[in-house]
Design a protein with these regions (language model features):
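N-terminal subdomain of nucleotide-sugar transferases
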Residues: 1-44, 57
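Membrane-proximal helix-turn-helix segments that form the acceptor-binding/catalytic region
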Residues: 89, 93-111
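Short donor-sugar binding/catalytic loops of nucleotide-sugar-dependent glycosyltransferases
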Residues: 9-11, 159-164, 184, 200
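Carbohydrate-associated surface elements
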Residues: 117, 138
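A short beta-strand/loop micro-motif in the catalytic core of glycosyltransferases
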Residues: 62-63, 107-116
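Conserved donor-binding/catalytic core segment of Leloir-type glycosyltransferases
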Residues: 112, 149-166, 170-179
Length: 208
């Protein structure tokens, strides 16, 4: 199958450092290629270029990974059209972002949710169950060095940007033998705590 994955066009794919959505698209790209699919990543802010590239490429399927580009869906000549919103508060959006549900519902594309809870929220808002699927996300474990015996079997580590919505500060206060790696943007997170290892490069994390 010939598949197009469409990114936001702000960061490179794969990203040079952090970039959750960009890593996700890259992992999808690699996994689909392993399955024998012909996969192209289109990563630009130029909407006309996206439409022309997809229509000229005669793709069997397209998966749009940026909700703000939903209005181009009707102009795509493709049998299978899918769209995913990566807005982090989609399960409980602020009032100014509830429009995203109608935007995706009326896009004409099949909605791919990142979790069961997000799918349930779409259904609660009147979107037909046949037009919503769930595609769980994760990491490519083959890219990480995994030791057979853990150096610290009684500890876990949370990797990622530290921010209020992810509630690392809450976990930190529970003293649950959890370490944290990532750049901090949460004033309630205690960066002097010995469980905080600061920001590390992606390569260091994969190698260690």
């Amino acid at each position: 199958m010939k598949i197009a994955l469409v990114g936001e066009g702000i960061m490179s794919i794969p990203p040079e450092g952090w970039g959750g959505v960009e890593h996700l698209i890259w992992n999808f790209h690699n996994q689909l290629k392993k399955e024998g699919d012909d996969v192209t990543i289109i990563n630009t802010k130029d909407l006309h270029k996206i439409v022309n590239t997809i229509n000229d490429g005669k793709f069997d399927a397209v998966h749009l990974h940026y909700d703000q580009y939903a209005n181009i869906i009707p102009y795509l000549n493709c049998k299978k059209k899918m769209i995913t919103s990566h807005y982090p508060y989609l399960e409980n959006p602020e009032p100014q972002y509830t429009f995203l549900y109608d935007l995706l519902k009326n896009s004409g594309a099949h909605i791919i949710s990142l979790s069961d809870k997000i799918k349930e929220e779409f259904l609660r808002r009147g979107i037909d169950s046949t037009n919503v699927s769930v595609l769980p996300c994760g990491i490519d474990t083959n890219s990480y060095v995994i030791d057979d015996e853990a150096l610290y079997p009684n500890r876990s580590v949370v990797v990622g940007k530290i921010e209020p919505r992810k509630r690392q500060a809450y976990l930190q206060k529970l003293n649950l033998n959890i370490d944290f790696i990532g750049n901090n943007t949460d004033s309630s997170f205690d960066i002097s705590d010995t469980c905080y290892y600061g920001e590390q490069s992606k390569q260091d994390i994969m190698d260690n």
